């Protein structure tokens, strides 16, 4: 398979003989297929399962007992070493607390992005990963060399592509990362796993935010922040049409869970100081759309999109593709740095729904192949 050949070339290009490879094994089919691919290429990676565990208040992670059983079976099948690493305290401090703090500010968090940046490729590397030449994962992403610079790049399967969840990592991190399954479709991964008789070959994909486990998201928010009843106001008329339990339960663009009749209704704005949710009615209300995004900072993984294009001045407007949420579609737009406002400005060619401050705008080249990085949205209109 082409992607498997790419992984071999990537390792050989490093010039490291007999490289030490760590695999972040979750117990799912993707990371299990990673182990199979590396083993068939002649490598003997060490498997690591990152355990989050349960905190004092009863918040628990995903079905870790089943996960560990799967990883143990995988390690036994290939006679590979396995280590279980507990990063519960670090996960709570860096990811869960970030989520709570972000929601409390009235912003929309991205815990998956922070988990990759701070835990999987951050704390793990500081504790264990630094001893290894490469860290391999089952993410649907690839890496590409352009003029001898390594870039994070998209997977050929747009539905499964996960570069948007990786867009806050840095160059040091991407240099160590291997994505052996990144160039395959999910169907191809399943076929590979079935042929290799992997224990997780038919296991269902995990869904949702991992640290919540079986806890409903709103239940998690309520346990963390409590409730604070407030008004729901129709933006166009200024009339109070309902009540909510707290602005932190709602995000821009939200349709479900408002408890309003005569809809559909969409959240178009939040007044944090007054604890008011503003909504508009209709299947496609214009108030839920915008074409302009502002970001205070831009995290460039390898090089900035301007450097990639050979442009020295970031105030020069350049054409890019971008995403503001995890979808298969890319949006065309222009990006520039506004020196007067100290803001990066992203202007979309078409109106986009639900621009939520706190979320991240992920920036790609116009062919949506290279993922340059991302910036947190501070304003959308």
Segments (PLM) and residue ranges:
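AMP-forming adenylation/ATP pyrophosphatase catalytic core
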Residues: 136-142, 151-381
